[in-house]
Swiss-Prot record:
Gene3D superfamilies: MFS general substrate transporter like domains
Induction: Transcriptionally regulated by PDR8.
UniProt protein name: Azole resistance protein 1
Name of a matching Pfam family: MFS_1
Length: 613
């Protein structure tokens, strides 16, 4: 009737959804074979380029379209990266307010763990729904988590908000690199990955400064409120300027003018997939959605892997703090965690490929495909990245703690000391991208970066309460060089190992790119918790040995609170104990970098494919 709002039936939404699905599938042509014959050679160069926005002319985006898409991706990635680094300067204030320093590592891990575990899932979600729709959904989830964190009234609520933000941040990080890699040819991906990595590094610069200013001048809650306007800007930039299939400036502007209808199409597309799942349960019973969960999204491996790593991290968190290391609770958590992770690997590598339905359905692939991961060129660089990230996040976090706990610096002043580390990360990422573009070499960059990591971590162990101002700057440069070089090169080194002629190249490309993100984020998650455990255990042991009794008991929480309210100089007994405990953390980081170098040496010598111009 006139005046009544229009409603959509199941069939209506199915129709619109099928229409959106057909358009999405048309836009997601992934393979373009370009053949180039020259007069000077009889050889035919073949370059297979993965494209997410293949148009009718099969041309990659250029000019304004390319730059606008990259800006949208870079800002989205900046948003996710900002939330990692901005919390490094609020640790003391949050611990003081909630009295939970032993759980402070979960400010990083609560964000990084879902970032790691869900990295492999986001690519699977994006394939049927569309990369654009999925990216927008990820930004919305991230914003919800940020708002919860800003309003938190307890450590548990704050960690919960960080977990939700981590779910969205994971989608942003995973899809940014997947989408970005489809916008240019293989030979130019090094530069593109460097540009996106720089947005991460710039967030690393801005994050601690913003966190320090907010914590010192306003409140630490603004470290999360600031994500809301930045996230809104990223959302609309990506909504307007990333449009697969549109190759000209005029087409993009026409598309922006059609924003209402475009937004409705996105909602209809998402609604179609949700109703399709609902329709399966009503019309076809439980079998088809169950099969999709088991084989399309590999839910069994995901549950085993998530539960396993969560148990392991909980054991590291509570061990030596709430429970003794040899207590039954900690031992059981370790055993269950390790068993579940091993079962996840066995299931994906050995059991999953044996199912007949998997053999008959090409798009049913495990989250971690042994066919790809077992390749030395992929396995070695990603393990090296995992170890480097674990060491780097440990150094990054406790460098801030060094200046706050030993010298009683404010959050803002402590953040200033990170500039040397972060600038070296940015410069290295850009330089490595340019070198790869010119020489097509990757392994030398990976090995040299790992060597710098070992040397830098070794030198950083000299950072104690006797170090002078020049040491405060110089000792932080090499860790940034190591992280910037390896984070930029490992993804490209993994991608070039894939067979471009394989019928599963598209899914393999997405899988390997997200696996690289998985290793990076898992390294940060484990590094954040393990470094917190090492510091706490070392500090308690040294306090007990020195027979120092704190007013409210010998715990790391009481140590930090007492130090803040009763600062007695950098060379006092407490100052020496904290300095020695921080040195133990830096030695742990050195161990991570040393292992990373071993794997980097065995990286593949394969070069990047030359561009056809």
């Amino acid at each position: 009737m006139k005046g009544e709002p229009k409603t959509y039936s199941m069939s209506d939404l199915s129709y619109y959804g099928e229409k959106a699905q057909q358009q999405n599938e048309k836009q997601q042509k992934q393979y373009v074979v370009r053949r180039n014959s020259t007069q000077s050679t009889s050889k035919q160069n073949v370059s297979v380029v993965l494209e997410d926005n293949a148009s009718e002319s099969n041309e990659l985006p250029k000019g304004f379209i390319l730059y606008a898409s990259l800006i949208a991706l870079a800002l989205s990635l900046f948003l996710a990266a900002l939330d990692i680094m901005i919390v490094s300067t609020i640790i003391e204030e949050v611990a003081k307010q909630f009295g939970s320093y032993s759980e402070i590592g979960w400010l990083f891990t609560g964000y990084s763990l879902p970032n790691a575990l869900l990295a492999l899932i986001w690519g699977r979600i994006a394939t049927p729904i569309g990369f654009k729709e999925t990216m927008l959904f990820a930004i919305v989830i991230f914003e919800i988590g940020s708002l919860i964190s800003a309003l938190a009234n307890s450590m548990s609520m704050l960690i919960g908000g960080r977990v939700i933000a981590g779910v969205g941040g994971c989608g942003i990080q995973s899809l940014s690199f997947v989408i970005g890699s489809t916008l240019v040819e293989e030979s130019q991906r090094g530069i593109l990955i460097a540009v996106l990595s720089c947005s991460f590094a710039i967030a690393s610069v801005v994050g601690p400064f913003l966190g320090g200013v907010f914590t010192s001048s306003v409140t630490w809650r603004w470290c999360f409120y600031v994500n809301l306007p930045i996230g809104g800007l990223a959302f609309f930039l990506f909504l307007f300027f990333y449009n697969p299939g549109l190759s000209t400036f005029q087409e993009t502007m026409d598309n922006i003018r059609k924003f209402p209808s475009q937004f409705i199409e996105i909602v209809r597309n998402v609604a179609y997939h949700l109703l399709k799942i609902k329709g399966f349960s009503k019309l076809n019973g439980w079998r088809k959605p169950f099969m999709e969960l088991i084989f399309m999204y590999d839910i069994i491996e995901f549950v085993f892997c998530s539960a396993g790593f969560t148990c392991i991290l909980l054991a590291f968190t509570f061990g030596g703090n709430r429970y003794a290391w040899n207590s039954a609770s900690i031992i059981i958590l370790f055993i269950i965690g390790i068993v579940l992770v091993v079962l996840a690997g066995i299931y994906d590598f050995l059991v999953f490929p044996k199912f007949n339905i998997v053999k008959a359905t090409p798009h049913y692939q495990p989250l971690m495909s042994w066919t790809n991961i077992k390749k030395p060129g992929i396995f070695t660089v990603n393990i090296a990245l995992f170890l480097t990230c674990a060491g780097y996040i440990s150094q990054f976090t406790y460098i801030v703690q060094y200046f706050q706990l030993i010298y009683n610096d404010s959050a803002w002043r402590a953040a200033v000391h990170l500039v040397a580390c972060i600038i070296s990360t940015v410069v290295t990422a850009i330089l490595c991208g340019a070198i790869t573009d010119k020489t097509r070499q990757i392994k030398p960059i990976i090995v040299i970066s790992s060597i710098f990591g070992v040397v830098g971590a070794g030198i950083l162990t000299l950072l104690n309460n006797n170090a002078n101002n020049s040491a405060h700057i110089g000792l932080l440069i090499l860790p940034g060089v190591a992280f910037g070089g390896l984070a930029q090169s490992s993804m490209l080194a993994s991608q070039i190992q894939l067979d471009k002629k394989s019928p599963t190249f598209r899914s393999d490309f997405v899988s390997i790119t997200t696996f690289n993100t998985f290793c990076k984020n898992l390294g940060q998650a484990l590094g954040g918790v393990i470094s917190n455990t090492v510091f706490s255990a070392a500090a308690i042991k040294k306090l007990t040995k020195a027979n120092i009794q704190l007013p409210d008991g010998t715990t790391v929480d009481n140590l930090v609170i007492y130090r803040q309210t009763n600062f007695d100089g950098s060379h006092s007994k407490l100052g020496n104990i904290i300095s020695e405990s921080l040195t133990d953390v830096f030695y742990m980081a050195l161990g991570f970098y040393a292992l990373s170098l071993i794997f980097a040496v065995f990286a593949s010598n394969k070069k990047v494919t030359a561009s056809l111009r």
